[in-house]
């Protein structure tokens, strides 16, 4: 039975990916910073013999190493990695602080890199696959998204380069780039910016709606599966046509 580690797996896209992969027969380890959220996620997934929660912060390199090691120790190996942990910060560049820069890059970029670095030796043995989570903001510019877009663009570039490094070992590395998704992160964004409405967000999309977490999750599951066995180095928009405008 295949095993996947999903960072940021206690809510949003990560939790949806955990549910989809469980349905498809995977063992699933999820990580997150808050134990109570992790326990709630395990209860929601309702498959105790095939799920495992690891408390940790992807901004900490030692925690990233431990997440991988605990997954391998508990399930006996690692076949897939999904780096869905991330934070969003909207604001004009002149209002960005050094602390903002450190926080977003530590979580969105360095956390992704660290997890992949520690996972690669284990994935090489299977071989396994990696799916990183970027954003439409990593593919095109957005007002008040210079910092966030920089982190997500870095994830895309990292994914494409790592795919070339890993290909000789038959490890595939791909990236999903969602637009706005109906997640707790989106709800927080709307609370923080009351001048932004859900309807205004929908108007950006040719399909005139926001994504559901399961739609992104199923794309992740596809990229991890043998159905995508000849796909690597791809940054795949899951954005209702937003980046096609």
Model regions: which residues?
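Conserved glycine-rich cofactor-binding loop
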Residues: 10-11, 34
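Substrate-binding pocket helix/loop in short-chain dehydrogenase/reductase
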Residues: 92-93, 100-105, 201
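Active-site helix of classical SDR
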Residues: 116, 151, 159
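Short C-terminal tail/terminal secondary-structure segment
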Residues: 140, 221, 232-245
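Alpha-helical segment proximal to the catalytic Tyr-Lys
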Residues: 121, 164-168, 229
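Short, small/polar-rich loop/turn modules that mediate ligand/substrate recognition or access, typified
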Residues: 82, 167, 172, 231-233
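Residue(s) in the substrate-gating loop at a strand-loop-helix junction
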Residues: 135
């Amino acid at each position: 039975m295949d095993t996947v580690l999903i960072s940021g797996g206690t809510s949003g896209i990560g939790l949806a990916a955990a549910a989809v992969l469980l349905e498809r027969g995977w063992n699933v380890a999820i990580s997150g910073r808050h134990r109570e959220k992790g326990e709630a996620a395990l209860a929601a997934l309702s498959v105790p013999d095939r799920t495992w929660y690891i408390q940790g912060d992807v901004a900490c390199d030692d925690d990233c190493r431990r997440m991988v090691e605990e997954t391998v120790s508990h399930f006996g190996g690692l076949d897939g990695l999904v780096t869905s942990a991330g934070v969003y910060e909207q604001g004009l560049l002149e209002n960005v602080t050094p602390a903002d820069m450190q926080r977003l890059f530590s979580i969105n970029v360095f956390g992704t890199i660290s997890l992949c670095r520690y996972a690669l030796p284990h994935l090489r043995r299977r071989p396994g696959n990696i799916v990183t989570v970027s954003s439409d903001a990593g593919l095109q510019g957005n007002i008040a998204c210079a910092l966030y877009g920089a982190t997500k663009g870095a994830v895309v570039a990292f994914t494409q380069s790592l795919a070339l490094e890993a290909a000789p070992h038959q490890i595939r590395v791909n990236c999903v780039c969602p637009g706005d998704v109906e997640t707790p992160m989106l709800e927080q964004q709307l609370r923080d910016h009351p001048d932004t409405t859900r309807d205004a967000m929908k108007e950006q999309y040719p399909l005139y709606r926001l994504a559901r977490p399961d739609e992104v999750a199923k794309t992740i599951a596809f990229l991890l599966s043998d159905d995508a066995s000849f796909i690597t180095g791809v940054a795949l928009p899951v954005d209702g046509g937003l980046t096609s405008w």
